[in-house]
Amino acid sequence: MSNTVVTGEVLDKSIREVVRILEDAVGCTAGPKGLTVAISKPYGSPEITKDGYKVMKSIKPEEPLAAAIASIITQSASQCNDKVGDGTTTCSILTAKVIEEVSKAKAAGSDIVSIKNGILKAKEAVLTALMSMRREVEEDEIAQVATLSANGDKNIGSKIAQCVKEVGKDGVITVEESKGFKDLEVEKTDGMQFDRGYLSPYFVTNAEKMLVEFENPYIFLTEKKINLVQSILPILENVARSGRPLLIIAEDVEGEALSTLVLNKLRGGLQVAAVKAPGFGDRRKDMLGDIAVIVGAKYVVNDELAVKMEDIALSDLGTAKSVRITKDATTIIGSVDSSSESIASRTNQIKAQIENSSSDYDKEKLRERLAKLSGGVAVLKVGGSSEVEVKERKDRVEDALHATRAAVEEGVVPGGGAALLYALSSLDGLKGKNDDEQWGIDIIRRAACAPIKRIIKNSGSEEAPCVIQHLLKQNDKELIYNVDTMNYANAFTSGVMDPLKVVRIAFDLAVSLAAVFMTLNAVVVDVPSKNDAAGAGAGGM
């Protein structure tokens, strides 16, 4: 294996080609009339999806330079997905347009540093303008936000709104595949979520989404640090014999204990994962007690307890219907052994503590515990007549759920690409220090029109230039173009609105990524040698 350095026009041409390929594949999914994409798999039937992030991740060019460029772009899309769970398609469309315009500036011999300064100056102005357009989302608008993100599927929108009503705006909502044929079902169950993720990525069971997913696991709780595997060996052996997974929630798991658990998992032994307990000090102790009540665990092992780790039996452990762990959070869904009486008793105890507390800070923390304990978990079960149908619908449900959370968190702006269009007024008084910096500002002006153009194009209409001209000429910044009805309407009464957080982060990341490519002067890529190819061939003989 040798490598080569690619520079100049060859590099610029490759960047343009890769960006165009990605935008064509991902951009076609934009809007309520966007199309689906089939992704072939090494085994089984192709997966059909409208999830822009999933489409982007699946594109892996064979040519080394193109593969390197695609990888850089996908990493940015991954950030968008991690931060908000939606907006990848918008991010891709914006990135492609900015890079296309920058390529023209480069070809004209413009000063790239000045162009970049103009772009970044315009970016800040647009982001400020977007913030000024936001408004809080009303409870009756939640279904509309979810429907729009689910490509116009009103059933998905109404079910997500039902979930929010069940557990509150800050409640825990998860999505699961159903065994039945019903499109969507909502199930309210006991459960809890806390802000601690897996201690090692090697615990992951779903590599595509970097998740740990356990069904019917045992749950062991301790306030102590676990350094030596010997101390929990009896628990591991008992759980292994049961054939069920194990979740360990402890102050910490480190050293020999963590490495042994990881090695065991990699060798295909016991399905196990470890997370740190939430909170600190006395609050950690209280929160572990809350979790114990939810999962029906008899003990939270600590130094005060006569029962040692080695003495814990299977019947002493907690249980749950399922557990879902990301790198940042753990969600416990549906206890098997807990009782509603024990949960009610614990909540009454916390309510009494709130009454008796004189500290506003303590009261706030107690209310947080009460909300986690009593709120429960809403589970959206996605069904269908085939595995392909279920997976495609689940993608849309998850996107809609992410959009809903973002809308609740930061509010909403006019949808369908209109918000970015109206934010362009912030550039009217913005002047560059020189012609090249002004060119950078104008690049953002053209790029911000790209999402609405793509949404209208995907609807089969060629009216995008006329629509953009009409929206920019009039003064009502709540007016949008609804591609479902092919008419103008008020964004908030018609339900065509986007979460500010999604639009803001997609735009910010797209411009930042394009700025990286602007100053990219060389890429070092590996090139397989003839000897490598011959060796690979000989291995198959």
From Swiss-Prot:
It catalyses: ATP + H2O + a folded polypeptide = ADP + phosphate + an unfolded polypeptide. One of its GO terms (cellular component) is cytoplasm. GO terms for biological process: protein refolding. ATP binds at residues 29-32, 50, 86-90, 416, 498. It is found in: Cytoplasm. Pfam families: Cpn60_TCP1. The keyword Chaperone applies. One of its GO terms (molecular function) is ATP-dependent protein folding chaperone. Its EC number is 5.6.1.7. CDD domains: GroEL. Keywords: ATP-binding, Chaperone, Cytoplasm, Isomerase, Nucleotide-binding. Its main location: cytoplasm. Together with its co-chaperonin GroES, plays an essential role in assisting protein folding. The GroEL-GroES system forms a nano-cage that allows encapsulation of the non-native substrate proteins and provides a physical environment optimized to promote and accelerate protein folding. Forms a cylinder of 14 subunits composed of two heptameric rings stacked back-to-back. Interacts with the co-chaperonin GroES. Belongs to the chaperonin (HSP60) family. HAMAP family: CH60. This is Chaperonin GroEL. It comes from Anaplasma phagocytophilum (Ehrlichia phagocytophila). The gene is groEL.
